[in-house]
Amino acid sequence: MELLSSSPAQLLRPNLSSRALLPPRTSIASSHPPPPRFLVMNSQSQHRPSISCASPPPGDNGFPAITTASPIESARIGEVKRETKETNVSVKINLDGHGVSDSSTGIPFLDHMLDQLASHGLFDVHVRATGDTHIDDHHTNEDVALAIGTALLKALGERKGINRFGDFTAPLDEALIHVSLDLSGRPYLGYNLEIPTQRVGTYDTQLVEHFFQSLVNTSGMTLHIRQLAGKNSHHIIEATFKAFARALRQATESDPRRGGTIPSSKGVLSRS
């Protein structure tokens, strides 16, 4: 068999005879630019929704303006001054506070309970009261509660965007207290505490029910207080104030799904 030999130059030389067999290329003029190498998805595609990363317009200080949509108006503060021949009471409550308590009623145990209201409700509570405590604590206890209820009423305003309802069960050692409330504008108190002693320190334990009845009357809330367990008078009363504070906090906080509307099918929550 005879081997064919070719030089390197011959191997690299193009085969003119095979190129001649190809048809000549035809150039087609087009006014459109060539298509892009990569497919660009339409921003309206249902498979890949477009996401805007544009910054908000600058504010007065040159930084992007930040806006927050809150269904609850700012500065929900209620302030009341109540003066009679028996007592002189001033109350200021900030529903959107930080749990700051500053109370001086002349009744040490009541001051301690108002501390629970502020701390567990995260309300800022300022109370000043003087009264005829040389007789007993009844008038001061009552008028402080009346003023707190009125301050709550003022702070809530039209009650737009709030949860309206609150429910909490608080334990304190052997005591267990359940509180459920509705900022309905209809005053009612359901109360079944069984406090075993007549006094805690110098405080008459009968005044606990009278405190909440007075608060309900002026605030216009529906309030139910139930004792599920408990033997120690101090524990029962303190757990009651803690549960009340937590339930009131729930009821006054914002419901973002409500969008600032009044939480009632009637469209109004009125004290009257």
UniProtKB/Swiss-Prot annotation:
GO terms for molecular function: imidazoleglycerol-phosphate dehydratase activity; metal ion binding. Residues 41-53 have a biased composition (Polar residues). Residues 24-65, 252-272 are annotated as: Disordered. Pathway: Amino-acid biosynthesis; L-histidine biosynthesis; L-histidine from 5-phospho-alpha-D-ribose 1-diphosphate: step 6/9. Its cofactor is Mn(2+). Coiled coil: none annotated. It comes from the Eukaryota. Substrate binds at residues 86, 112-120, 138-142, 164, 186, 234-242, 264-266. It is found in: Plastid, Chloroplast. Its main location: plastid. Its EC number is 4.2.1.19. Mn(2+) 2 binds at residues 138, 142, 210, 235. Mn(2+) 1 binds at residues 112, 139, 234, 238. Binds 2 manganese ions per subunit. Substrate binding triggers a switch in the coordination state of the Mn(2+) active site between six- and five-coordinate species; this switch is critical to prime the active site for catalysis, by facilitating the formation of a high-energy imidazolate intermediate. Keywords: Amino-acid biosynthesis, Chloroplast, Histidine biosynthesis, Lyase, Manganese, Metal-binding, Plastid, Transit peptide. It catalyses: D-erythro-1-(imidazol-4-yl)glycerol 3-phosphate = 3-(imidazol-4-yl)-2-oxopropyl phosphate + H2O. Changing residue 73 to Q: Loss of activity. Weakly inhibited by inorganic phosphate (Pi). Competitive inhibition by 2-hydroxy-3-(1,2,4-triazol-1-yl) (e.g. C348), a potential herbicide. Residues 1-52 form a transit peptide. GO terms for cellular component: chloroplast. InterPro entries: IGPD_sf, ImidazoleglycerolP_deHydtase, ImidazoleglycerP_deHydtase_CS, Ribosomal_Su5_D2-typ_SF. It holds the Pfam family IGPD. GO terms for biological process: L-histidine biosynthetic process. Belongs to the imidazoleglycerol-phosphate dehydratase family. This is Imidazoleglycerol-phosphate dehydratase 2, chloroplastic. It comes from Arabidopsis thaliana (Mouse-ear cress). The gene is HISN5B.
